[in-house]
């Protein structure tokens, strides 16, 4: 036991292990999604064409590559999510239920007052934020492991209106946000009847507890 806080030490260890594996599972999901949206360049023939078509239909890009500077239209706003899910699934857009985004994107949405935080009432009857937000009714998961691309500035070259002209462009940071529908990814238990257990060795060092 933690003599300073009265907290069960092994319970703390279990909680830390749970958080660790939750983070690993989240990393795995993001790696899978990154792979899915990279498949437009994979395969051959009809398969490559189908892969590219899927990625194109399910990607809503507001970065406006080639623009001279970053504008408000290149940032998330009140219409971005609705437009993106409509492009992907049309009248089935209501099936989307989870948004995964970078904290910079989430902060921008907060500043625009587009995120609504779930609330609960504590034992004193005071309503408090739960710390989990929704955007247009979709749960928002914030993770700084989301893909981030730093796009370099481009200097103007050539003459405007002539062949080979390249317009100037400011440097900017491009963030990727994923929106998932119900059943997009299934999480299945491995089937272990006892995923972990405690073992105690009373004869060693006055008694040791081991989490196995």
Language-model segment annotations:
Residues 1-9, 85-108:
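Structured, hydrophobic secondary-structure cores that serve as assembly/anchoring elements
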Residues 2-87:
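Alpha-helical scaffold segments that mediate packing/assembly in large oligomeric complexes
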Residues 11, 15, 94-95, 205-209:
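Residues at beta-strand starts and edge strands
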Residues 22, 89-90, 110-114:
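Signal for well-folded cores of large energy- and translation-related assemblies
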Residues 51-83, 104-106, 110-212:
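Sequence/fold signature of self-assembling virion shell proteins
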